């Protein structure tokens, strides 16, 4: 008789399409551990099916405009922080994209974002990233700097899209049709993918800044105005990556 360890290993190494055969194989095994394992994987299968339904509901705009050709999702991260750049990302996903768990990056754990970042970069038709520095933000204001980063992201795509799906904004000075979608990062897989890549890109930058400017806690606060960050700002003064126009109340 197979041990529980062996059976767990079989389930763990099985592909999704093999689960039903394993369920049938072990359905008459009366050991409670085996039956609990079967229930566990039944729940896993149901969760995957539920996620496919949810993901499909986020392809409404992609299906509506797919006749136009390449669709590009655009989103930004970092409009609100006191320090660091604003980062924008443009992502063109393939029409048959089957990536699961895409969502507004704020609704995902850091671990899940990192996993999806790799999958998106591997499967996307093209990805472009743009950013505006703290100095540029101070020079032209955060809204204009965000638009500039978005235009930069689009310009860095290796393929020209026929339509832009934007999270809530219409980007000026860009010669492509645009569809602004309120809360688009939760309604469009393309925008969600852009949200995730932008978030991971910026978070990694802030973690690197933390290594040379550890007193501000950038690895944890990512430049946002946490109580500890504001306290450090008052104690040490602004760093080279602080946005001067954002910190006038604190220094």
Tell me what each language-model feature is.
Residues 1-72, 79-251:
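RNase H-like, Mg2+-dependent phosphodiesterase core
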């Amino acid at each position: 008789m197979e041990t529980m360890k062996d059976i767990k290993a079989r389930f763990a190494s099985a592909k999704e399409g093999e689960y039903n055969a394993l369920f049938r194989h072990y359905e008459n095994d009366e050991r409670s551990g085996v039956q609990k394992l079967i229930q566990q994987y039944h729940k896993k299968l149901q969760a995957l099916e539920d996620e496919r339904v949810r993901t499909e509901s986020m392809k409404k705009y992609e299906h509506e405009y797919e006749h136009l050709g390449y669709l590009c999702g655009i989103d930004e991260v970092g409009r609100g922080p006191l320090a660091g750049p604003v980062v924008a990302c443009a992502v063109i996903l393939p029409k048959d994209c089957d990536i699961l768990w895409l969502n507004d990056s704020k609704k995902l754990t850091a671990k899940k974002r990192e996993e999806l970042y790799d999958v998106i970069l591997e499967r996307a038709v093209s990805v472009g990233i743009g950013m505006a520095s703290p100095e540029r933000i101070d020079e032209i204001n955060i809204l204009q700097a965000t638009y500039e980063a978005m235009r930069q992201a689009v310009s860095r795509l290796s393929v020209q899209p026929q339509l832009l799906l934007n999270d809530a904004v219409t980007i000026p000075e860009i010669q492509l049709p645009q569809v602004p979608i309120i809360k688009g990062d939760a309604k469009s897989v393309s925008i969600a993918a852009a949200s995730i890549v932008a978030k991971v890109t910026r978070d990694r930058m802030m973690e690197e800044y933390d290594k040379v400017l550890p007193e501000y806690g950038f690895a944890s606060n990512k430049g946002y105005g946490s109580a500890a960050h504001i306290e450090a700002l008052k104690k040490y003064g602004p760093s080279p990556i602080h946005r001067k126009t954002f910190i006038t109340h604190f220094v």
